């Protein structure tokens, strides 16, 4: 169903402009109005204001990722191999997922033991619970080594 044409209040126009205006209205009556140009999501027109002071640019939201650290580890292990952006995104998601699981498990352990603080002991136990077998043993030994190095330096 086509939208009804908008009715405008009658206003007196000069005699010479009436025929041109009527012709334009008749021509547009059967056609759909042109769609306005849309801006990408999150961007507004410069003149619209949108709660910000005119002339100021919107501050970029900082997004923290593990990409630089993944790349550094890759170069330590395989200096001659690169990584695609899609693979980097997958690795970043993987690390975020593991971090979330470990943090959740550590929080549960602290709650069970009625402790207000998550210590290295809770982290170590959660690593043993979340990661399987040999991987957990290696992760615990590497973590212990890293904490020892951090506290001695």
From Swiss-Prot:
Q: Where is the major localization of this protein?
A: nucleus
Which locations, inside or outside the cell, does it occupy?
Nucleus; Chromosome
A cellular component annotation (GO) from this entry: nucleosome
Q: What does this protein do?
A: Core component of nucleosome. Nucleosomes wrap and compact DNA into chromatin, limiting DNA accessibility to the cellular machineries which require DNA as a template. Histones thereby play a central role in transcription regulation, DNA repair, DNA replication and chromosomal stability. DNA accessibility is regulated via a complex set of post-translational modifications of histones, also called histone code, and nucleosome remodeling.
Modified after translation how? Can be acetylated to form H2BK6ac and H2BK33ac.
- Oligomeric and partner information: The nucleosome is a histone octamer containing two molecules each of H2A, H2B, H3 and H4 assembled in one H3-H4 heterotetramer and two H2A-H2B heterodimers. The octamer wraps approximately 147 bp of DNA.
Protein name according to UniProt = Histone H2B.3
Q: Which gene encodes it?
A: H2B.3
On whether Nucleus is a keyword of this UniProt record, the answer is yes
Say if the entry is tagged with keyword Transcription regulation. no
Q: Where is this region: Disordered?
A: 1-61
């Amino acid at each position: 169903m086509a939208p009804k044409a908008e009715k405008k209040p009658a206003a007196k126009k000069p005699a010479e402009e009436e025929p041109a205006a009527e012709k334009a209205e008749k021509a547009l009556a059967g056609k759909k109005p042109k769609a306005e140009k849309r801006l990408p999501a999150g961007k507004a027109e410069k003149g619209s204001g949108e709660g910000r002071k005119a002339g100021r640019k919107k501050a970029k939201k900082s997004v923290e990722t593990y990409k630089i650290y993944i790349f550094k580890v890759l170069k330590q292990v395989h200096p001659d191999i690169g990584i695609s952006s899609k693979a980097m995104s997958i690795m970043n998601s993987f690390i975020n997922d593991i971090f979330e699981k470990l943090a959740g498990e550590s929080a549960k352990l602290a709650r069970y033991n009625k402790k207000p603080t998550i210590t290295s002991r809770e982290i170590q136990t959660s690593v043993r619970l979340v990661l399987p077998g040999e991987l957990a043993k290696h992760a615990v030994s590497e973590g212990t080594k890293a904490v020892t190095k951090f506290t001695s330096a």
